[in-house]
């Protein structure tokens, strides 16, 4: 029966094998003839005689190789294929077929970056999306670019200058910035070229850099607009401060590590009382910044002290209030908390809530300032040791006990980050966050996987104002100017240029004013938050690209920057363009090592993508990465890469077989007949022999399933389903079955059908796999005859093509019969080269279609073609045969004497049975020992019991086989 699905997806262009006029099939075309089996040596001979080479579209440029001439796919050809794609303009959006554009802004890697597995992950996933949509006829734009990476780039250049004995401050700002630009021009393209190695089919003609003139204009425009709305302000607030870099850093640039340390117990005298309150702290050096002691309001131990004051040690009698607040954890330390709001994020928030003063005791280089008295000028960690010694000397040190610390360290350099109150520029986030929350709530924005919506909502609901200023020289200079002589926090000018700022200053203060620009630059994430629309021409809303491609369709990135980048892009997109910048967000996880550990240099488990490409090929790496699940971490191992390299080789070898099997190009008549077979038409499908009908039907089912998975972004399902179909159905079954038709004596008609099916199925497999494995599939595609276009732009297979469910069931019966015979051969150790006889028994209906595939069955099962018999009743020598049940209504009998030397087999199985029995007895003895059962780990005992059960089943089956052999021996002797 023929089934057609109602599944609806974007309709691709008609394929090469699907002309507008349907072919009327000649009913005599598929006449069946008896054919003989061909030996492997004969097949090789035929292969050699029928070899031919097809000219590829770019063969003149030596771009492509062919399985006809190359034993394996040559990884070195990947670069040539990539350059050819790019030279043909395939990466640019093509509006010829109409349709709505598919647009992805590439997450811009740092210009200082070197390719790592995180890059490989996002490039693979985004390229899959882009290639799939391109093949579906949509104009695709994958817009690439790099980030200026303020801190990282400045550090790289400073290090380079240091090797020359030059300091940044000696050069001055302008000269240093010039040197950074020179470095960028020389080395900035490294990461771009490495991304190309991964096969990224992005439009490099539109490549952007966050410090490009146009993007810089967008940054200034955004700052001015936000300031004009009162959303940007300047103030002194708590930030993450890098003492070495002398700048504020973002939360993402702070990594917390669990490290051994101490919890210091220190006594504070209660003023006007002989009593002391003992606090516990991990940072005694900050006590100079204490502004209060806090206890829990329900802690009866300290309730009588609330409202009194305490004297801070080593501060010459400075008093601080003793307060009560539920923020205090009664069970931590002593239950008394010192409040140092100038040097602790939580203390800072509590002080702001309660109106406590903020006292800073640190200089920007992490030495203590004059508030610390005698400790002024000493490093914070040196003060910790000296202060504790002094406290011990005066009797205020109670004890210090080992304690695991959660230490904030800089992502760059590893220094300990200092919470510090500093004058910075901030964005007021609450009004922006409200709109971003509504975007998800109103389904304007879909986050994949859905579970990350909760994290997104939590972050935006509890959002803090964003510190956007950095004390660096490399980056977008903050568009704020000050008037010389009027330096105060409130007296500044925001303008789009120095000329505009001077004009405003003259207007405000009259003649003879001198202005200077704020020395700080903007946080790199500020320019990145504008990326989806600044790269398309904004703030010029009339720009062609902005109108054609904004808003974009998809933002794909790691789940770790959902807040730092994705949420900020959503907020800025809504604020400046009135719409979400992308309709979908696809989040991937981390790539870990084979043991599930995060890759790090310290562990020595970092896998280099470029080394991986060299050893396994880009396609194997991409396929391995793509088999993951959205939002989940992926464990990467050489075993997986090796397996998928083998998959690449299997594809190549299948291509070699298909090419060998096709008619010679000089045989134009054969090619006309072959191309005239429209295998996506129902009438053609119904006329195919069973194996061919099965293969095409299974392919059509696969196309629907895989296309649906592509649409749902279930890439792991796409990879697994296509892999299984290619390897199990096509390579293991259909290619093997086709050999009985291609190289036998049955004439050209059935051979032509098999050739057409081989080509049709293989070319569609290449299409389905191309987004995952672009290089090997394009190379194989170009080797196939009559290719009118490159695979990268060939139409996606059509959906809802016919399939014959009955043929699938029938071929599955043939497979079951083949497996049963193969298993019997293995069980009785029949030599692979030996052809055996068989009697196939089944109903008249089953025998009718199975017998038509006698040659296929004989080839796949290694049967003697002249001694394969079909009947609806068991043979006369059934009691001397191995009885196989393949499926309901389909059985087989294999004459035992023709298969093996029965007496030798009896001896062999008897030895095996004896060995099994010995193993079984030993296990039973262990289980009979109370000492073992009572003292051995539970899982060990359970494992032994499972071995016993397994052996019992094996012994039972082996005894049955031995009894059968012995009974056969006695019957034969009679």
Swiss-Prot record:
Location in the cell: Plastid, Chloroplast; Mitochondrion
One CC-aspect GO term: chloroplast
Sorted UniProt keywords: Aminoacyl-tRNA synthetase, ATP-binding, Chloroplast, Coiled coil, Leucine-rich repeat, Ligase, Mitochondrion, Nucleotide-binding, Plastid, Protein biosynthesis, Repeat, Transit peptide
Residues that bind ATP: 601
Coiled-coil regions, chain positions: 489-518
LRR repeat segments: 432-454, 857-880
Motif ('HIGH' region): 109-119
A Pfam family this chain is assigned to: Anticodon_1
EC number per UniProt: 6.1.1.9
InterPro entries: aa-tRNA-synth_I_CS, aa-tRNA-synth_Ia, Anticodon_Ia_Val, M/V/L/I-tRNA-synth_anticd-bd, Rossmann-like_a/b/a_fold, tRNA-bd_arm, tRNAsynth_Ia_anticodon-bd, Val-tRNA_synth_C_sf
Molecular-function annotations in GO: aminoacyl-tRNA deacylase activity; ATP binding; valine-tRNA ligase activity
Disruption phenotype: Embryo defective. Developmental arrest of the embryo at the globular stage.
Keyword Transport: no
Catalytic activity entry: tRNA(Val) + L-valine + ATP = L-valyl-tRNA(Val) + AMP + diphosphate
Sequence motif 'KMSKS' region, location on chain: 598-602
GO BP annotation list: embryo development ending in seed dormancy; valyl-tRNA aminoacylation
EC main group: ligase
Family, similarity comment: Belongs to the class-I aminoacyl-tRNA synthetase family.
The protein's name: Valine--tRNA ligase, chloroplastic/mitochondrial 2
Upper lineage: Eukaryota, Viridiplantae, Streptophyta, Embryophyta, Tracheophyta
Protein encoded by which gene: EMB2247
């Amino acid at each position: 029966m023929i089934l057609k699905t109602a599944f609806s997806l974007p309709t691709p262009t008609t394929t090469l094998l699907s002309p507008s006029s349907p072919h009327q099939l000649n009913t005599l075309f598929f006449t069946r003839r008896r054919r003989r089996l061909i030996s492997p040596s004969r097949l090789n001979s035929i292969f050699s005689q029928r070899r031919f080479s097809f000219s590829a579209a770019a063969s003149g440029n030596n771009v492509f190789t062919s399985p006809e001439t190359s034993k394996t796919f040559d990884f070195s050809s990947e670069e040539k294929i990539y350059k050819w794609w790019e030279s043909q303009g395939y990466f640019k959006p093509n509006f010829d077929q109409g349709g709505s554009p598919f647009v992805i802004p590439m997450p811009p890697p740092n210009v200082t970056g070197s390719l790592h597995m995180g890059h490989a992950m996002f490039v693979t996933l985004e390229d899959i999306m882009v290639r799939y949509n391109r093949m579906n006829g949509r104009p695709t734009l994958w817009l690439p670019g790099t980030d200026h990476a303020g801190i990282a780039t400045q550090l790289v250049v400073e290090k380079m200058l240091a090797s020359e004995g030059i300091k940044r401050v000696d050069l001055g700002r302008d000269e240093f910035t010039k040197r950074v630009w020179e470095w960028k021009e020389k080395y900035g393209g490294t990461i771009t070229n490495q991304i190309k190695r991964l096969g990224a089919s992005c439009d490099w003609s539109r490549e952007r850099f966050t410090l490009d003139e146009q993007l810089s204009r967008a940054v200034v425009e955004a700052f001015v607009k936000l300031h004009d709305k009162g959303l940007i302000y300047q103030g002194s607030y708590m930030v993450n401060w890098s003492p070495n870099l002398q700048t504020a850093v973002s939360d993402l640039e702070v990594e917390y590590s669990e490290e051994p340390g101490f919890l210091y117990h220190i006594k504070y005298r209660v003023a006007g009382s002989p009593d002391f309150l003992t606090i516990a702290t991990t940072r005694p050096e900050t006590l100079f910044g204490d502004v209060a002691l806090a206890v829990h309001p329900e802690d009866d131990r300290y309730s009588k002290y609330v409202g009194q004051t305490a004297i801070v040690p080593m501060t010459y009698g400075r008093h601080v209030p003793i307060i009560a607040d539920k923020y205090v954890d009664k069970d931590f330390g002593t239950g008394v908390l010192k409040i140092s709001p100038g040097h602790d994020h939580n203390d800072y928030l509590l002080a702001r809530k309660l109106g406590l003063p903020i006292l800073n005791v640190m200089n920007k280089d992490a030495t203590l300032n004059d508030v610390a008295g005698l400790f002024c000028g000493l490093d914070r960690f040196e003060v910790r040791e000296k202060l504790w010694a002094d406290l011990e000397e005066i009797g205020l040190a109670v004890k210090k006990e080992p304690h695991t610390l959660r230490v904030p360290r800089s992502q760059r350099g590893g220094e300990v980050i200092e919470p510090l109150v500093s004058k910075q520029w901030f964005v007021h986030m609450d009004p922006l966050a409200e709109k971003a929350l509504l975007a998800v709530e109103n389904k304007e924005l879909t986050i994949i996987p859905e579970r990350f919506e909760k994290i997104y909502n939590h972050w935006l609901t509890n959002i803090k104002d964003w510190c956007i200023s950095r004390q660096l020289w490399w980056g977008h200079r903050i568009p704020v100017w000050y008037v010389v002589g009027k330096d105060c926090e409130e007296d500044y000018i925001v303008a789009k240029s120095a000329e505009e700022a001077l004009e405003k200053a003259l207007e405000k203060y009259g003649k003879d004013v001198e202005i200077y620009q704020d020395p700080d630059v903007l946080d790199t994430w500020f320019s990145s938050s504008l990326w989806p629309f600044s790269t398309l021409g904004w703030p010029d809303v009339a720009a062609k690209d902005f109108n054609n491609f904004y808003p974009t369709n998809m933002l794909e990135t790691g789940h770790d920057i959902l807040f730092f980048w994705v949420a900020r892009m959503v907020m800025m997109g809504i604020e400046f363009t009135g719409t979400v910048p992308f309709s979908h967000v696809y989040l991937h996880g981390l790539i870990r090592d084979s043991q599930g550990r995060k890759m790090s240099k310290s562990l020595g488990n970092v896998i280099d993508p470029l080394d991986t490409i060299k050893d396994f090929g880009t396609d194997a790496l991409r396929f391995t990465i793509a088999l993951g699940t959205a939002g989940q971490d992926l464990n990467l191992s050489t075993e997986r890469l090796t397996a998928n390299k083998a998959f690449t080789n299997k594809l190549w070898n299948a291509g070699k077989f298909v090419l060998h099997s096709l008619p010679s190009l000089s045989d134009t008549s054969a090619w006309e007949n072959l191309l005239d077979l429209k295998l996506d038409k129902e009438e053609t499908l119904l006329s195919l022999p069973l194996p061919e009908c099965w293969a095409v039907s299974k392919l059509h089912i696969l196309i629907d399933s895989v296309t649906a998975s592509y649409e749902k972004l279930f890439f792991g399902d796409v990879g697994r389903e296509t892999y299984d179909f290619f390897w199990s159905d096509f390579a293991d079954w259909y290619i093997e079955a086709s050999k009985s038709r291609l190289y036998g004596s049955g004439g050209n008609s059935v051979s032509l059908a098999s050739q057409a099916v081989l080509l049709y199925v293989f070319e569609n497999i290449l299409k389905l796999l191309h987004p995952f494995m672009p290089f090997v599939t394009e190379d194989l595609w170009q080797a196939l005859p009559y290719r009118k276009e490159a695979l990268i732009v060939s139409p996606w297979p059509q959906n809802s093509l016919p399939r014959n469910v009955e043929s699938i069931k029938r071929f599955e019966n043939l497979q079951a019969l083949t497996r049963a015979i193969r298993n019997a051969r293995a069980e009785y150790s029949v030599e692979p080269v030996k052809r055996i006889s068989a009697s196939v028994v089944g109903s008249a209906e089953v025998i009718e279609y199975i017998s038509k595939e006698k040659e296929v069955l004989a080839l796949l099962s290694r049967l003697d073609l002249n001694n394969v018999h079909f009947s609806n009743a068991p043979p006369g020598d059934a009691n001397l045969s191995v009885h196989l049940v393949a499926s309901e209504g389909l059985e087989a009998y294999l004459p035992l004497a023709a298969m093996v030397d029965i007496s030798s087999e009896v001896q062999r199985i008897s030895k095996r049975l004896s060995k099994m029995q010995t193993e079984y007895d030993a296990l039973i003895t262990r289980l009979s020992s109370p000492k073992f059962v009572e003292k051995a780990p539970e899982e060990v005992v359970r494992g032994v019991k499972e071995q016993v059960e397994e052996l019992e089943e094996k012994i039972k089956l082996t005894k049955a086989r031995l009894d059968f052999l012995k009974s056969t021996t006695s019957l034969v002797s009679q």
